[in-house]
C-alpha cells in the first residue's frame, strides 16, 4: 500500500525529517507520535504530495508520489478554515468531487450529492446537509471535514492532528467515529497526533519519531481486543503498558551512534 524509503525534508538549513522508512499495509491504521517539532506534519505533507522531499521516496500502490495522488484524502486540525461558510454542508462535502483528478471519472451533480449524503450519513450528520458549517459545533464541523474526505472514497486517509481543537468528550467521540468508519470502509489511515492515549487507543501500530530532525525511533504493535471502547479498553493492563512505553520513548532522547543519549 504505502512504502516510504529514506524520506528527508529540509527547510533551508533546517533539517525537519531525515531518513524515514515506513511501510503501511492495506486496511491498517497507523498512528505517528513524537516530541513537538519532530516533523510529524512535514512527514504527512510529504506523503500527501504537498511538499517535495529533499531526499528519499514515497510510493503509494506501486506508484511514486510526485504530486498530490488520486485516491488520497487529508483531514487537517483547523477544520474552520477548510469549510466554506457560504456553502451548505452537503456542498462542502461534495466539493472535492468536482475537482477530481487522475483516472477516476468525475461524477455528475446527482452522483456528487449522493456521495456527499452517504458520507454525511457515515459520520452521523445526515440531517445537517442543508445547513451551513457556521451553524454547527466544532466537533460537528470536524465530522463534516471527515465526511468530505470519505466522499472521495480514498484508498489512503491522512489525518494531521484532526482532533486537537475539540474538547475531551468530543475528542473521544471522534476517536470512536474513526474506528467505526475504518471498520465499515476497510480504509487505510495514517494519523498524526500529539496525544499518546489516542495513538494507542486508535492504532494498530504506533510509530514514534525522535526529536528533530525526525527519524523513526520505534514501531509498537497494538494488540488490544476489539471492539475497543473508551472505558474498558483504557482500563486494560496492556493499554497501560503500551501507553507507558510510548510515553517513555517520546520523552527520552534517542541514543546516538555511540549509544549515548543525543543532546
Q: What does each model-found stretch correspond to?
A:
Residues 132-136, 140:
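Conserved ABC ATPase signature
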Residues 101, 107-128, 180:
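Conserved ABC ATPase "signature" region
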Residues 151-155:
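A short, proline-enriched helix->beta-strand linker immediately N-terminal to the Walker B motif
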Residues 33-35:
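The feature captures the beta-strand-to-loop junction immediately N-terminal to the Walker
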Residues 56-68:
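Conserved ABC transporter NBD signature motif
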Residues 48:
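Helix-to-loop junction immediately C-terminal to a conserved catalytic motif
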Amino acid at each position: 500500500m504505502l512504502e516510504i524509503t529514506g524520506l528527508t525534508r529540509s527547510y533551508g538549513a533546517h533539517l525537519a525529517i531525515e531518513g524515514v522508512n515506513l511501510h503501511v499495509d492495506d486496511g491498517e491504521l497507523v498512528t505517528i507520535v513524537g516530541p513537538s517539532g519532530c516533523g510529524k506534519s512535514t512527514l504527512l505533507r510529504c506523503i500527501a504530495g504537498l511538499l517535495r522531499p529533499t531526499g528519499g521516496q514515497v510510493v503509494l500502490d506501486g506508484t511514486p508520489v510526485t504530486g498530490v495522488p488520486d485516491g488520497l484524502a487529508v483531514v487537517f486540525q483547523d477544520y474552520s478554515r477548510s469549510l466554506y461558510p457560504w456553502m451548505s454542508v452537503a456542498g462542502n462535502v461534495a466539493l472535492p468531487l468536482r475537482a477530481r483528478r487522475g483516472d477516476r471519472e468525475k461524477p455528475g451533480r446527482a452522483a456528487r450529492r449522493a456521495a456527499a449524503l452517504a458520507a454525511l450519513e457515515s459520520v452521523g450528520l445526515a440531517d445537517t446537509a442543508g445547513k451551513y458549517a457556521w451553524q454547527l459545533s466544532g466537533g460537528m464541523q470536524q465530522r463534516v471535514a471527515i465526511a468530505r474526505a470519505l466522499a472521495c472514497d480514498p484508498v489512503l486517509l491522512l489525518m494531521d492532528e484532526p482532533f486537537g481543537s475539540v474538547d475531551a468528550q468530543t475528542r473521544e467521540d471522534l476517536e470512536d467515529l474513526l474506528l467505526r468508519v475504518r471498520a465499515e470502509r476497510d480504509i487505510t489511515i495514517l494519523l498524526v497526533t500529539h496525544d499518546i492515549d489516542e495513538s494507542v487507543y486508535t492504532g494498530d501500530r504506533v510509530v514514534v519519531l525522535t526529536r528533530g530532525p525526525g527519524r523513526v525511533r520505534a514501531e509498537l504493535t497494538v494488540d488490544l481486543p476489539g471492539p475497543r471502547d473508551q472505558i474498558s479498553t483504557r482500563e486494560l493492563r496492556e493499554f497501560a503498558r503500551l501507553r507507558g512505553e510510548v510515553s517513555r520513548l517520546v520523552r527520552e532522547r534517542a541514543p546516538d551512534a555511540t549509544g549515548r543519549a543525543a543532546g
